[in-house]
Amino acid sequence: MDIELTKKDGTVIKLSEYGFIVNDIVIDSMQINTKYQDKENMNGRILMGSNYISRDIVVPCFCKVKNRSDIAYMRDMLYRLTTDIEPMYLREIRRKEELNYRFTQPTSDDYVKLDKNNFPDYEYSRHDQQIYVNGKQYKVIFNGVINPKQKGNKVSFELKFETTELPYGESIGTSLELEENKKVGLWSFDFNIDWHAGGDKRKYTFENLSKGTVYYHGSAPNDQFNMYKKITIILGEDTESFVWNLTHAEIMKIEGIKLKAGDRIVYDNFRVYKNGVEISTETNIAQPKFKYGSNKFEFNQTVQKVQFDLKFYYK
């Protein structure tokens, strides 16, 4: 078991590579904030709404040292690796099956080989290798205080993280990588992806059409400005009023400027661009939104091309 931390500068850290053994990875469900309102002379209360706030992730781990004088060194190294004040991405790593090793009849010449962390280095099968459990990552920040607990030459720690901007798990890959079948290792079984050739659930680029359907795999909707999505549209006709819609979004409009066939319109979260120049003030501010399953889209003209580049989010 292990965790992988990707820092803001691109540095990638696995605790096992520094001599720390992870006991468990506890990913809590999301904290929910529910608001109610009381009414005078009314029994009960009125539900005003709920929203997800954050998620806690706890990672108990330990290290063993040859000499007790090394304890301070290992302790300070763990602090340096994990206690950043900037967000980082966390991935979960586990073995596919319970660890097994080959039993042999010992002889007088036998010895146990040790790895670089002084743990027995048994001859494992390929099923004993540690793997990423899924294609999700969590944007987290270190939260809390580490209190080392020493017992002999073993020191135990508990690392506490919490999600920052979003409480959701985020797909590492994008819809375009999924469509192009790139980096298959980015995806996992729980994403429920249809890998058959030509499957509609992996199609995110469309040409010469006025309406169609795009599939969103995430269990949490991609409906906020701080969720990754970029919709690129190549217009097929000259117009001064371009209108389109998605199943779960408000009608999106661009009006008051001249648009030509071949113009490249990009919806980059809450900003809109025409051929690289921002035109957000010429829109009705509505943004694309996607929910699990099929999301129908329709334009008021036949566009040359539309491409949906987005990430999927999970509860």
Please state what every model-predicted region is.
Residues 1-9, 94, 309-315:
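Short, intrinsically disordered N-terminal pre-domain segments
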Residues 44-70, 78, 152-167, 295:
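Oligomerization/assembly interface segments of phage tail-like spikes and tubes
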